[in-house]
UniProtKB/Swiss-Prot annotation:
Name this protein carries in UniProt: Riboflavin biosynthesis protein RibBA
Lineage: Bacteria, Bacillati, Actinomycetota, Actinomycetes, Mycobacteriales
Pfam families: DHBP_synthase (PF00926), GTP_cyclohydro2 (PF00925)
List of residues binding Zn(2+): C264, C275, C277
Organism (species): Mycolicibacterium gilvum (strain PYR-GCK)
UniProt-annotated stretches for the region DHBP synthase: 1-204
């Protein structure tokens, strides 16, 4: 296992104007970024970063800074597979030449971090790429964008960083992997930390969710304990239906059966046959009840894969006219999937989960949760319930969104009723 340095060392180095190396989860980008605070940018730091990275230097910023500077999204519909929120590129209006030199880019970076800067201080497009970080940082999204802003804040600096991916010195056509990053960090006396460790550090020192109430909920699948939560970063409420003793026989919270279910009014409440959400929720409750120990976490604010109820109905309207579920979202100027699972991960940790068997047919959900220090030991498939109304939707999820849904090609619309089974 690669030796990592402490978060405390990384924060101290950031405060001192040094760069650090930050690695993410191997199931995500599996890359290491050089990171330093934007307000500490110098020509020397920028030149060092350009020398050892791809050279595509980005400046992660807190959302309020992006708003103040009028930094709009680079593209109306974010199609980046990791949800990196690129904004329009910029250069400083004053004090630079072409904008591309290390000195020019350092000037632009410092100006982006300056609390007194305004939108008119920049020209667009430019040679520096600002990124909009999620509110809540790595506790909401386990990315380098959020890690850079978190490290700057923890160092007592403005919420602005500079990042770029480190290129392998062995194979310049590839990105450096963990073992090589350790060698690189040692050669240049840089701290090497992981986003997972930063998440764990923040989780120990901060809390962004609040447990509000608990009550007994008898259901047709048996009795559950309903635990209600709020989050300071979201104006929504979430509820976890808990069965049994989550700590388990060894008191360690391992091997818990978990379903993280996205709110779906039409499917869960109205019984809509356009999706498979209602049957998935019912199956998850039944499976947890049979297990005698587990959690069904009901995530509010995830309606329509995070786009909201009205947008979801608009997407349905487009689907009625022939679009599939992905293209309908994109036509509305919305991402195919806008959900994040950071709050859900915090709730699971608060409930005592440390490792879990995740009930899902969506491999992306595993990646969305795995970066938060929650060890997913198994992905447990849910039954697929296809019918004439949702078969095209399910095939789109399989073919365009990577969901693990087998057997759909055997569905026969001429046969009444539902088709499916465990996958």
């Amino acid at each position: 296992m690669t030796r990592l340095d402490s978060v405390e060392r990384a924060v101290a180095d950031i405060a001192a104007g040094k760069a650090v190396v930050v690695i993410d989860d191997e199931d995500r980008e599996n890359e290491g970024d050089l990171i330093f605070a934007a307000e500490k940018a110098t020509p020397e730091l920028v030149a060092f970063m350009v020398r050892y990275t791809s050279g595509y230097l980005c400046v992660p910023l807190a959302g309020e800074i992006c708003d103040r500077l009028g930094l709009l999204p680079m593209y109306a519909v974010n199609q980046d597979k990791h949800g990196t929120a690129y904004t329009v590129t910029v250069d400083a209006k004053v004090g630079v030449g072409t904008g591309i030199s290390a000195s020019d880019r350092a000037t632009t970076m410092r100006l982006l971090a300056d609390p007194d800067s305004v939108a008119d201080d920049f020209t667009k497009p430019g040679h520096v790429v600002p990124l909009r970080a999620k509110d809540g940082g790595v506790l909401r999204r386990p990315g380098h964008t959020e890690a850079a802003v978190d490290l700057a804040r923890l160092a007592g600096l403005q919420a602005a960083g500079t990042i770029c991916e480190i290129v392998s010195q062995k194979d310049e056509g590839a990105m450096a992997q963990t073992d090589e990053l350790r060698i690189f960090a040692d050669e240049h006396d840089l701290a090497l930390i992981s986003i997972a460790d930063l998440i764990e550090w923040r989780r120990k020192h901060e809390k962004h969710i609040a447990r509000v109430a608990e009550a007994r909920i008898p259901t047709r699948h048996g009795e559950f304990r309903a635990v209600g939560y709020t989050s300071i970063y979201e104006d929504v409420e979430h509820v976890a239906l808990v069965k049994g003793d989550i700590a388990g026989p060894h008191g360690d919270g391992h091997d818990v059966l978990v379903r993280v279910h996205s709110e779906c009014l039409t499917g869960d409440v109205f019984g809509s046959r356009r999706c498979d959400c209602g049957p998935q929720l019912d199956a998850a409750l039944a499976m947890v009840a049979r297990e005698g120990r587990g959690i069904v976490l009901y995530m509010r604010g995830h309606e329509g894969r995070g786009i909201g109820l009205m947008h979801k109905l608009q997407a349905y309207q487009l689907q009625d006219a022939g679009d599939d579920t992905v293209d309908a979202n994109l036509k509305l100027g919305l991402p195919a999937d806008a959900r994040d699972y950071g709050t859900g991960a915090q709730i699971l940790v608060d409930l005592g989960v440390r490792s879990m068997r995740l009930l899902t047919n969506n491999p992306a959900k595993r990646v969305g949760l795995d970066g938060y220090g929650l060890h997913i030991i198994e992905r447990v498939p849910l039954p697929v319930r296809a019918n004439a109304e949702n078969i095209r939707y399910l095939m789109t999820k399989r073919d365009r969104m990577g969901h693990d849904l087998v057997g759909l090609d055997d569905f026969d619309e001429a046969v009444p009723g539902e088709f499916g089974g465990a996958v």
